[in-house]
């Protein structure tokens, strides 16, 4: 069979023209792009390939930023907490912040846009009781001894955080920090639209404008040693300015307070249950960002080019699963692929013509150096993401960075050639078809579809000890044969019958976080809707501290469904006798030994009629319970692994009372998975490991056959 070409984007630069042509041929690439820190060679204009041009809406024009310092982008910063030991307290604003990145904004009215908080009382300090001294950079407070205080203030972003990150990682020398200007403000808005037109007129050879992005950077702050200090990939605190906030006040109908963003210092991160004011601000930002983004996209279309958005960096307000996004008219979205869940962040996007995954490793020296192993990183990245692609296909793949680094690793070049060929085959077999889904699953949390697939993410695709046991559920779902939706508590309050659309509901997270739900569980509309859903035959899987909030004599509000409760000292007087395990349960049939619960949970005990599957030292790790016609499953934590993915798969089937549906498009070996595309008349069997595997494969009609597979292998079959 002749090798195919296409659906692959590669980076280039001025010093790798011949090498770019070689790699294009080797990998079958049909698109070339520039990257941050590289330039597109004019010699490659006429290769016949699609040409992407990275376009920065908010930076790479320091002359404009310097001439209009009042329209440089800003962010809200809160100082650390300081304890007053006398009646006067001074707080230095820029402590532990990188001085070249931020500059305190004293241009606008600090009495209106700053806030000094008494963190002991939770109240703002009256303006007449504090003052700012520019010569020292300190705020002086008339304090109450032994109360604690913080200062929330606006700062200009003098060095774009992403440009700074790239400069630090790559050790760029003598590079002028790129300032971040605010495209939303009047003069810069007018200038930016003209600037875009100038770019299009001088880059007639460009086919795709790759916007990076529209228009506000996620929260990323560096400390005085240029180390990452604070990051929130969903953070809104760098999308502010007095100009924007005054517009918000007019729309919202109430005065803005810095605390609506600062949120006691938590900055409304993904784990915080969002306040009404913060939701209002997000909705306002989404509408305004979408309107301006549409203007830019329309201009690109006017010049006969495609508009692509990079999902990251300055992307706040562009949440792609919200209604505003559909009105923008983008042709494509490209996203960085860290794992299966990060791929689903953009592969599930509607209202675009195509999506593209930028795979790892990025061609930067942190991976491509003597002793580095880019092949290993590429294998892990591809095999992990492939599970998700098989459930929700993307249309293109690509790579970024310095091509001159990648070509120094011939084994890497050879492996990516295999990946490109495999992807094209995969695309041909599954594109345009919904894969077989055994059940409809809803993940319930405070964010719903707004943060679908990213609701346990702090920084893009990175591991955190405190959440990997929960994120494992999301990663497993990203490549499992379920029709997965993300719903919020507000969705249920608006329409309790919504739950009838699903077979199983999953709630995963720690108590009183946005993931678990906190006080939403004492809202009778929510709790009764979930109980009714399960009682009438639905399934409920709770992981960690699901439905947990101390109320009316219990912590687990759905203890009647899950059959477990958490001992917090209030039930020590009550003896517990149910500790027998039932490890022969349907859910555990494929487990070879001990189940990995990750960090697990302490002090979980079972109610008298609950069936415990696993307990350790009289702490329940997994249990099942029947409630009416429905079933509940409790799991203390479930990090991602192939075995745990199978545990979750069986838990979904059991909770939905669908054990008999197990042997349908199924592999007996949990390291191997089966995906069926009935409309296309095809199915595939995929080995997710780096070793050969043997399995028995069940087809959709229940018939089966034995199969030996090589490492990472994927086999395609016809149905029928």
Predicted regions and their residues:
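Polysaccharide-binding and catalytic clefts of secreted carbohydrate-active enzymes
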Residues: 69-327, 345, 431
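The substrate-binding groove and active-site-proximal loops of carbohydrate-active enzymes
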Residues: 6-12, 29-35, 100, 170-190, ...
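A glycine-rich, often tryptophan-bearing local segment used as a flexible ligand/cofactor-contacting loop or short
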Residues: 517-593, 598
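Catalytic domains of carbohydrate-active enzymes, especially glycoside hydrolases
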Residues: 9, 15-50, 195-212, 325, ...
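Extracellular ligand-binding/catalytic regions of CAZymes and related secreted enzymes
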Residues: 220-223, 404-437, 478, 557-572, ...
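Hydrophobic targeting/anchoring helices
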Residues: 44, 62-68, 196-197, 207-214, ...
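Noncatalytic N-terminal accessory/assembly modules of large enzymes
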Residues: 2-59, 63-100
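A short, well-structured beta->alpha microelement
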Residues: 8-22, 35-39, 309-318, 474-498
């Amino acid at each position: 069979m002749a090798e195919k070409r296409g659906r692959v984007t590669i980076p280039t630069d001025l010093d790798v023209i011949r090498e770019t042509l070689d790699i294009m041929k080797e990998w079958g690439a049909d698109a070339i792009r520039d990257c941050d820190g590289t330039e597109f060679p004019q010699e490659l204009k006429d290769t016949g390939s699609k040409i992407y041009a990275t376009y920065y809406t908010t930076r790479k024009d320091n002359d404009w930023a310097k001439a209009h310092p009042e329209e440089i982008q800003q962010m809200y910063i809160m100082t650390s907490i300081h304890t007053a030991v006398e009646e006067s307290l001074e707080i230095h604003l820029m402590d532990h912040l990188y001085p070249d990145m931020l500059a305190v904004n004293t241009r606008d009215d600090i009495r209106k846009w700053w806030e000094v908080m008494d963190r002991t009382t939770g109240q703002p300090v009256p303006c007449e009781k504090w003052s700012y001294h520019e010569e020292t950079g300190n705020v002086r407070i008339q304090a109450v001894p032994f109360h604690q205080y913080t200062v929330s203030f606006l700062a200009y972003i003098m060095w774009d955080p992403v440009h700074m990150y790239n400069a630090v990682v790559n050790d760029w020398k003598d590079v002028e920090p790129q300032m971040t200007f605010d495209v939303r403000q009047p003069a810069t808005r007018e200038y930016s639209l003209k600037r875009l037109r100038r770019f299009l007129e001088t880059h007639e050879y460009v086919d795709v404008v790759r916007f990076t992005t529209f228009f506000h950077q996620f929260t990323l702050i560096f400390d005085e040693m240029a180390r990452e200090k604070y990051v929130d990939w969903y953070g809104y605190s760098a999308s502010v300015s007095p100009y924007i906030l005054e517009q918000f006040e007019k729309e919202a109908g109430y005065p803005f307070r810095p605390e609506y963003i600062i949120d006691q210092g938590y900055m409304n991160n993904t784990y915080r249950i969002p306040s009404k004011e913060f939701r209002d601000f997000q909705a306002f930002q989404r509408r305004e960002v979408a309107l301006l983004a549409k203007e830019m996209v329309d201009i690109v279309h006017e010049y006969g080019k495609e508009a692509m958005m990079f999902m990251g960096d300055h992307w706040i307000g562009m949440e792609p699963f919200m209604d505003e996004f559909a009105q923008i008219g983008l042709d494509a979205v490209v996203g960085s692929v860290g794992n299966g869940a990060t791929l689903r962040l953009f592969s599930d996007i509607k209202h675009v013509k195509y999506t593209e995954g930028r795979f790892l490793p990025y061609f930067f020296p942190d991976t491509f150096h003597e002793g580095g192993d880019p092949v290993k990183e590429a294998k892990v990245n591809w095999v992990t993401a492939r599970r998700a692609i098989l459930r929700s296909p993307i249309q293109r793949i690509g790579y970024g960075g310095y091509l001159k680094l990648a070509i120094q690793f011939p084994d890497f070049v050879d492996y990516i050639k295999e990946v490109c060929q495999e992807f094209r085959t995969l695309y041909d077999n599954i594109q345009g078809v919904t894969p077989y889904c055994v059940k409809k699953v809803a993940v319930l949390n405070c964010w719903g579809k707004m943060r679908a697939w990213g609701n346990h993410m702090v920084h893009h695709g990175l591991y955190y000890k405190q959440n990997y046991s929960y994120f494992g559920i999301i990663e497993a779902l990203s490549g499992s044969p379920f029709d997965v939706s993300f719903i919020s508590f507000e969705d249920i309050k608006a329409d309790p019958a919504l739950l009838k659309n699903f077979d199983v509901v999953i709630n995963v997270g720690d108590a009183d976080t946005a993931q678990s739900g906190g006080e939403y569980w004492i809202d009778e509309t929510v709790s009764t809707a979930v109980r009714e859903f399960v009682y009438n035959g639905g399934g409920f899987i709770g992981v960690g501290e699901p439905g947990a909030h101390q109320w009316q004599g219990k912590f687990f509000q759905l203890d009647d469904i899950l059959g477990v409760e958490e001992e917090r000292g209030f039930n020590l007087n009550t003896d517990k006798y149910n500790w027998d395990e039932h490890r022969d349960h349907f859910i555990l049939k494929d487990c070879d030994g001990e189940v990995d619960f990750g960090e697990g949970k302490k002090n979980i005990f079972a109610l008298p009629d609950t069936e415990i599957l696993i307990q350790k030292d009289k702490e329940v790790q997994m249990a099942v319970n029947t409630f009416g016609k429905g079933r509940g499953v409790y799991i203390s934590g479930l990090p991602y692994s192939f075995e745990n993915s199978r545990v979750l798969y069986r838990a979904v089937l059991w909770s939905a009372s669908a054990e008999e549906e197990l042997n349908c498009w199924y592999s007996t070996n949990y390291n191997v998975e089966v995906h069926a595309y009935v409309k296309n008349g095809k199915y595939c069997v995929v080995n997710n490991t780096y070793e050969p595997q043997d399995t028995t494969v069940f087809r959709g009609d229940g018939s089966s056959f034995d199969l030996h597979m090589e490492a990472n292998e994927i086999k395609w079959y016809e149905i029928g």
